[in-house]
């Protein structure tokens, strides 16, 4: 996967794809490759990316052979939306809007697919957002979710990598909380049955509340998703054939629930 202008000028692309750390760069390239592979089925569809960041994923998707007919990137900050709109102004079919615009009635059932990458782990309240996704999706619409693995052996590897990256002055991890030995032990043996440690809540400069990665339990999220959507496929990244219990991120491909019982 090549990263070209104006993609590489995006804020996240600069610190992820173009990171001085080979491990960070490789991991994010592979994460996007897995996601783009899953999103190929959205060819000719209308797609929304909730929490699109700098727009890199949508731009790459629109440049692929199996690209959507139209793609809409959504963010909460006006300056981010303006930056994305300016950098991708020549990309046909790609637009960006503020999150508040999704409340307009014309967006109900307007999308064949909703993508949400590395967002849900930061949400203090996830259920209302899932309800909104269901409202935005048309009949049998698809939901593509990716979240980080912050439990089990991957957590130990990530914490070591974060410390090393911080020591080298690479990347920025605002709001990243440290773990006590007891919290690490609980995180190693976390399950889908209960929240294993208390998650810290931070407040942004704008007054919004959010979680960092500490204590995020992807297994509990999977259970929550399966109560509202039908789970079609689970994939790991950066290595797609790995079990999520040994991976850095996990992808869920789901379908809007029309009465089926999710496995």
Question: Which positions does each model-derived feature cover?
Answer:
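S-adenosyl-L-methionine-dependent methyltransferase catalytic module, highlighting the catalytic core
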Residues: 3-30, 79, 100-103, 124-138, ...
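Short, intrinsically disordered terminal tails adjacent to the first/last structured region
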Residues: 262-263
